[in-house]
Amino acid sequence: MNFVAFERAKQGTGASRRLRNSGKTPGIVYGGSAEPQMIELDHNALWHALKKEAFHSSVLDMEVAGKTDKVLLRDVQYHPFKQCVLHIDFQRVDDKTRLHMKVPLHYSGSEESNAVKVDKCMVNLIVNELDVTCMPSDLPEFIAVDLSKLEKGTSLHLKDIKLPRGVTPVIRGGQHNPALVSVVPPVVVLEAPVADAAPAPVAEAKGKGKAAKPAATAKPAAAAAKPAAKPKAKK
């Protein structure tokens, strides 16, 4: 995959801002025996190129001032909320130096496996890209992984897939054979049996006679008698 870049003379925050306002993206290419070079690219062309997987994972042919160099995309800085590429970095590729890259994994065939087709399991993709080292001429655009042989209760590990010629995986974290794909059995929902409804309580039979009237409220007690008058003293 090839693209065109242009030499950039001015650098700095102000120069980069003016460059972006004119529809360009500032960048740099470094590595190899040559000195780092400031470049600029057409933003719209770069934006569409970045949507392609091959632009991120394969050796690119970059043309600058009539000269073509083989490079790898190493870093992209995006605006936090605008569709804008702020800066981009490329590294020159030496044909005699091994590369360390992340290569996408392309999975296929899971729908034809017994795990999915017969046992109705779910396929969980644990790893979507693989760290590898290889010579530039051996770098694959992607690694195809066949899942048509998956069975219930199994997993697919790194040693189960066939890597392209000259490609060596980079193992991290002490895992010599990490899992790439796991098979998740279907979830069976057991419905609890519905208990028989309890019979409704029988209403009490109504009395034949009329309901007794409530007892009459007692009248308040008579007021206490007045004390007797004192006898008059005799003269």
Curated annotation (Swiss-Prot):
What Pfam family does this protein match (any one)? Ribosomal_L25p
| Superkingdom, natural source | Bacteria
Q: Please provide the Gene Ontology terms (biological process) for this protein.
A: translation
For this chain, one GO molecular function annotation is:
5S rRNA binding
List, alphabetically, the GO terms of the cellular component aspect: cytosolic large ribosomal subunit
Compositional bias ranges of the Low complexity kind: 212-228
Q: How does it assemble?
A: Part of the 50S ribosomal subunit; part of the 5S rRNA/L5/L18/L25 subcomplex. Contacts the 5S rRNA. Binds to the 5S rRNA independently of L5 and L18.
Report the function annotation for this chain: This is one of the proteins that binds to the 5S RNA in the ribosome where it forms part of the central protuberance.
PANTHER family under this entry? RIBOSOMAL PROTEIN L25/GLN-TRNA SYNTHETASE, ANTI-CODON-BINDING DOMAIN-CONTAINING PROTEIN (PTHR33284), RIBOSOMAL PROTEIN L25_GLN-TRNA SYNTHETASE, ANTI-CODON-BINDING DOMAIN-CONTAINING PROTEIN (PTHR33284:SF1)
Say which family it is in.
Answer: Belongs to the bacterial ribosomal protein bL25 family. CTC subfamily.
According to UniProt, the name of this protein is: Large ribosomal subunit protein bL25
This chain is encoded by the gene named: rplY
